[in-house]
Amino acid sequence: MKYLCLAYGDEAGWNALNDNEKQELLANDRVIRDRGNLVTAVKPQVTAVRNWDKNLKVTEGTDEHHGLPLAGFSIIEAENVEEVIDLVANTPCARANGVIEIRPFWNLEN
């Protein structure tokens, strides 16, 4: 099954880590790729489009509407949600005062 993992966090949490902690967390990201679980991920560039009341607003960067900005997302293939939790629990956003939302995809092939 494939799972969408939304990563929320900000640079302050990341910058608060020492270099060894950062390297350890980035190594955990590499494990997900090396195991073949990572399906895809996005680049950090963001363009936000908002069209409230037919008033189009396009901005470079996140259009923050809550406490933490969306830092990125990935699509991970795993046997179950517990495996995904194990994979993402020690990634940068999960550890640097952020949060990762895990959402399973519908199986639309049947």
In which residue ranges do the predicted regions lie?
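Conserved, structured core segments of small domains
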Residues: M1-N110
